[in-house]
Amino acid sequence: MPVASARIRSGKVAATCTDVHRVRPSVPEAPHSGPWRGSVSTMKKLINAVDNVVTDALRGMAAAHPHELDIDLDQHIVYRRRPKEQGKVAIISGGGSGHEPLHGGFVGTGMLDAACAGEIFTSPVPDQVVAATSAVDRGAGVLHIVKNYTGDVMNFEMAAEIVDAESGIQVASVVTNDDVAVEDSLFTAGRRGVGVTVMVEKIAGAAAEQGRPLDEVAGIAARVNAAGRSMGMALTSCTVPANGKPSFDLPEGEMEIGIGIHGEPGRHREKIAPAAEIAERLVTPILAELTALTELDSAGADEGVIAMVNGMGATPLLELYLMYGEIARLLQDAGITVARNLVGNYITSLDMAGCSLTLVRADAELLSLWDAPVNTPGLRWGA
């Protein structure tokens, strides 16, 4: 299967259960000609065929990063091209496609060893997770980082059970659940896992890179999740290629506060306000929760927050920086130090216009792990 100069894995893990959703059907080659199968009247997208969007995107990712990534186009798994030696805890994550660079863009030194890509806004199947877990194990166990969506949690849990029964690989799991907009939704039991997932993958990945044991890496990941909260908003909805129309209707002049990353509408709708007021809508509920958190379980003192202003996919960087400026001002007024920050697209929702804010209370250890070298398509520093 030709993919530029990138090495492509192939083959599947044999199915050992009767769940028909466990095994991914074979994926055809991308067409080079022929009709574009989509609703031309309702959406415009740079795609070939709706059915092949994820495979085509992974093929392009392999061509763009031939020296960093090793991509299995059959299983839709992104692997770190040069894994560390035996004895390193491996970390995998995954979820529906459409949130790029999450998760595949965070595979590499200092973050993930593998990422499982589901179809757009659809959880990866257990067989993908089993294959990735078995492939990346270096004898020290594997950490699964899972966003709190029912399908993701169920399929990763099933995969861990299969791995335990078939190979005995030690697996730990951390479920992210940082979205303050909802306590429950159609997709979750409890809060949704959103922006803090990026922080968990970065900080836990640094701990694993240092050679720390599985229980310690998992404990650090859980600490980051517990210390983080997020809130998002949208100016427009997003369009899933297979649907051909926006996931919800948002009239001109209105915005949604508290949206999800799968095109879920927000918890309330209101007239579009100036950026300063929108920033306040995001900061206020997050700070209400962060100030209620107990002191972090670490030897260091609270060092402030790591702040991420994240674009939802169609928001210009100019506007994201403008929003960060307003948010930084509000945090300063509240007496909160921004120790580190990210501004850009890190966990998106296809072509949605809008942004989200994630704040993580950090201590000296978490900041040190945050600052550790990372070399992935989506995050790079110090490497």
Which residue stretches match the model-derived regions?
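Glycine-rich phosphate/diphosphate-binding loops and the adjacent beta-loop-alpha structural elements
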Residues: 245-322
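Short glycine-rich or small-residue beta-strand-to-loop segments that form or flank ligand, phosphate
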Residues: 44, 89-96, 112-115, 141-151, ...
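C-terminal non-catalytic interaction/assembly regions of soluble proteins
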Residues: 285, 294-383
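Internal, active-site/partner-interface "lid" segment
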Residues: 182-191, 201-264
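Intrinsically disordered, low-complexity segments enriched in small polar residues
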Residues: 5, 10-11
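N-terminal amphipathic/basic leader segments beginning at the initiator methionine
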Residues: 36-91, 364-366, 370-383
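Glycine-rich oxoanion-binding loops at beta->alpha junctions
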Residues: 99, 106-138, 287
